[in-house]
Curated annotation (Swiss-Prot):
The gene is DCXR. It is an enzyme of class 1 (oxidoreductase). It comes from Bos taurus. Its main location: membrane. This is L-xylulose reductase. Coiled coil: none annotated.
Length: 244
């Protein structure tokens, strides 16, 4: 199925590794013009070697002023994927101010800021656009040691709905994807303990974790005009976890 993404200009945050990097590669392969955002220059440099022509921006999205300076003049953007996120796994009684502040700065505040930049540009141009926020199954379930992470993703789901309501009249669609554990290198390392993995897999009706392409394919569909009537949705990519 041709998603007709060729020629569209897309901005992807958290583009240096994992899901974000794979999103950039898929968009590039589909003919989109991609702006890749990461806080790690070495990751961006290697990404450009893989995908010549990709534009890069190196900035720490936890820094509001630096983000404004780096992205304020990014130019016209048609598609935005807010993928950047951090996760500090701490028991509730041991949550630190530093983990709380960093988590909400990156997982929620940066989404607001970058989305504002892109949406204002779309409205000024009178152009339609699409925003996809990468959330998590953790937004809708209580997971041990994930109190702050779950909170940020729950807030992101609600933000997605509000953005869809307010930006819809401007022909800007906003959706979220909510993956289960994804088999990125980080995911593989975090869930390598068979006992830990079994406890989660037993809660997934399909009995497996998600592959990166499962998430990327869903995001590309939501970015495309094939989903032109879909906005304000949180789309599980979880093998049925949230259905249980």
């Amino acid at each position: 199925m041709d998603l007709r993404l060729a020629g569209r200009r897309a901005l992807v945050t958290g583009a240096g590794k994992g899901i974000g990097r794979s999103i950039v590669k898929a968009l590039h392969a589909a003919g989109a013009r991609v702006v890749a955002v990461s806080r790690t220059q070495a990751d961006l440099d290697s990404l450009v070697r893989e995908c010549p022509g990709v534009e890069t921006v190196c900035v720490d999205l936890a820094d509001w002023e630096a983000t404004e300076q780096a992205l304020g003049g990014v130019g016209p953007v048609d598609l935005l994927v807010n993928n950047a996120a951090v996760a500090f796994l701490q028991p509730f009684l041991e949550v630190t101010k530093e983990a709380y502040d960093m988590s909400f700065s990156v997982n929620l505040r940066a989404v607001i800021q970058v989305s504002q930049i892109v949406a204002r540009g779309l409205i000024a141009r009178g152009a339609p656009g699409v925003i996809v926020n990468v959330s998590s199954q953790a937004s809708q379930r209580g997971l041990t040691n994930h109190s702050v992470y779950c909170s940020t993703k729950g807030a992101l789901d609600t933000l997605t709905k509000v953005m869809a309501v307010e930006l819809g009249p401007h022909k800007i669609r906003v959706n979220a994807v909510n993956p289960t554990v994804v088999m990125t290198p980080m995911g593989q390392a975090a869930w390598s303990d068979p006992q830990k993995a079994k406890a989660m897999l037993d809660r997934i009706p399909l009995g497996r974790f998600a592959e990166v392409e499962n998430v990327v394919d869903t995001i590309l569909f939501l970015l495309s005009d094939r989903s032109s009537m879909t906005t304000g949705s949180t789309v599980p990519v979880d093998g049925g976890f949230l259905a249980t």
